[in-house]
Amino acid sequence: MARIATLVAVLAASAAVAAVAVASTRSPKALRTAIFAAARKEHSVHYVEHGAASVLRQTMVSDVAKTRGVQKITFTLQGEKGQFTVIVVNRIAYLRGNSLALHAYLGFTSAQTASYHGRWISIPPGNGRYEDLAASVTLPSFLHDIYPGAPLALVETTVGGRKITGVRGTSRQGGVTFQEAVLPDAKLRPLAVSDVDTKHGFVDAIKIGRWNEPVRVKAPASAVPIATVTAG
């Protein structure tokens, strides 16, 4: 499976990144500031994220802009395949998924899943599901989610034959603390991100590119409010 091969490659790369600290006139904090300052000047980005845990393999393909974006997620959970899509338009999240995604992955009840799989559901800010669903589906949210925290260190690896100096720190998501490395492109924008949690066996890798392409996303017609879905 292609995404498994990608994860293996990224594991090797992230191990190298974690192992090699480099000397530089720029401090880790200054490099982090420069990377995210460059990214915040842009209007949109495309990224592909591969993740793996003990019983889960997943791929997220996303196109995100300042106030809108779309994220398509495919996954295999304990050998079963699922998929769902999240759209964010003007701070409203819209979700559509198959039965496995709604019930086993996202925690909807069996009755809710039976009624609403394959249909768009709208989730406003303030709803308990909003934060997790809307995470990384706009450009500001994505940059927030890949921002490495202290302690910081400079790291070096080779991508496509080119040596790249990045910054390594920590990222806390869903109660799990990852060792996170962010590598910049030639314009100092994020190019690749790796997250590893050896304690729980979580691995995550993101390839970033195609900056400033149009993100044409509209709110789905006839979406069912989440309050209606959960009222039954």
Show where each model-derived region lies.
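N-terminal leader/targeting segments and the immediate start of mature chains
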Residues: 4-68, 150-158, 213-232
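Short, solvent-exposed coil/turn segments at beta-strand boundaries
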Residues: 39-44, 60-72, 87-93, 160-164, ...
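Beta-turn initiation residues at beta-strand->coil junctions
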Residues: 49-53, 73-78, 97-99, 171, ...
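Short, solvent-exposed loop/hinge segments that bridge or flank secondary-structure elements
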Residues: 53-61, 127, 131, 175-176, ...
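An acidic-aromatic
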Residues: 65-134, 203-205
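Transition segment at domain starts
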Residues: 132-144, 152-154
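Gly/Pro-enriched, hydrophobic low-complexity segments
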Residues: 155-224
